Amino acid sequence: MGKEKGHINVVVIGHVDSGKSTTTGHLIYKCGGIDKRTIEKFEKEATELGKGSFKYAWVLDKLKAERERGITIDIALWKFETPKYNVTVIDAPGHRDFIKNMITGTSQADCAVLIIGGGTGEFEAGISKDGQTREHALLAYTLGVKQLIVAVNKMDTTGWSQARFEEIVKETSNFIKKVGFNPKTVPFVPVSGFQGDNMIEPTTNMPWYQGWQKETKAGVVKGKTLLEAIDSIEPPARPTDKPLRLPLQDVYKIGGIGTVPVGRVETGVIKPGMIVTFAPAGVTTEVKSVEMHHESLDAGLPGDNVGFNVKNVSVKDIRRGNVCGDSKNDPPMGCASFTAQVIILNHPGQISAGYSPVLDCHTAHIACKFAELIEKIDRRSGKKIEESPKFVKSGDACIAKMVPSKPMCVEAFTDYAPLGRFAVRDMRQTVAVGVIKAVEKVAPGAAKVTKAAVKAGAKK
């Protein structure tokens, strides 16, 4: 076996009718995690139902249906490989909680693939004023997804028209520029997700197509297919050199072992023997051991979902939403308030000071009050439009001071991105998203330091 391939997460965005499922299904089907047996089973069902042309979307529909019935499907089904990477498709959108998932970041996307329907009228619908496409692209950008690929789909329905492709490239370039991307760094690939043109193999139907190119720090990169474009994603910097931040997903009590917090390492490294602090609980203790998939680790790295055993801490002391960090290296703290840039997505009324919805930030789920609307800003440029507005409504962006209703631990987006973005939930939907600019931290009072931590500290 050669060196293991790098791992990247790709989020697929675009209007519901752009052919996202077919395109994603095609890649997963041809390069991916769906085993032959499952495919044969699906093909047989498709034929029996008269869907004999076996659209790739059928694969995705099946997976989605199973997922929505609460059958957890082996997540490998949402994976495919390129020569350089193992790619995970994050929660193919169209899914209710897409926005929430993208923000609370079960996994942060390294790149977004924007699928545009090339058919007449489709493209226009997708990026009209209220288009979903605009919202998703803006979200991706706001939440720190800085790489983008545009696939112009359904080229087969345009008679493989060069003029139509060029028109869409021009319009889409303007559109993504407004969102914040630089079109020169974005590959534009004409494809047919259904027929397979330019997906994995170069097409023969578009002799005019010379290939895509994008500018990178290292120079110009060129290619033909969508698979090559995904393969050319620049590898993400995994933040191992930052101080540890590990938001807890759960805390278990395991007989004979003790208390075992579980969560995903977002930044830094967790190792046995480390003295860690949990915020906002203010508990400090020693890490006895670190495990992943029931195997003990010398170190848990960013992206790893780990369980770790802590000494002399009861399950009552720490909980989901707490953040674990290194007590000697910028330990996490609770916050009294924080300032954030908030984009209102869909709220039926007006939001003014005093509004207290629930915030989902990393694994925390806590009501926070909009204590003060500091200024209304242009959501693209970030420039101030109005000082101390009385209210904001859907489509607006503002800088607001937020006060959590109970202790919580968050960070500025520029310091620790995964702990610096949040979704505002109300009426069972995501009404706004935000990025934290600054945090007013609270030094813990008489915090609990376990005997194990004191002993281990004295040894050092």
UniProtKB/Swiss-Prot annotation:
One of its GO terms (cellular component) is cytosol. It is found in: Cytoplasm. GO terms for biological process: cytoplasmic translational elongation; translation; translational elongation. Keywords: Cytoplasm, Elongation factor, GTP-binding, Methylation, Nucleotide-binding, Protein biosynthesis. GTP binds at residues 14-21, 91-95, 153-156. Residues 14-21 are annotated as: G1. The modification N6,N6-dimethyllysine is found at residues 3, 316. The modification N6-methyllysine is found at residues 3, 30, 316, 390. SUPFAM superfamilies: EF-Tu/eEF-1alpha/eIF2-gamma C-terminal domain, P-loop containing nucleoside triphosphate hydrolases, Translation proteins. It comes from Schizosaccharomyces pombe (strain 972 / ATCC 24843) (Fission yeast). PROSITE patterns: G_TR_1 (PS00301), G_TR_2 (PS51722). This is Elongation factor 1-alpha-A. Belongs to the TRAFAC class translation factor GTPase superfamily. Classic translation factor GTPase family. EF-Tu/EF-1A subfamily. This protein promotes the GTP-dependent binding of aminoacyl-tRNA to the A-site of ribosomes during protein biosynthesis. PANTHER family: TRANSLATION FACTOR (PTHR23115). Residues 70-74 are annotated as: G2. Pfam families: GTP-eEF1A_C, GTP_EFTU, GTP_EFTU_D2. Residues 153-156 are annotated as: G4. The modification N6,N6,N6-trimethyllysine is found at residue 79.
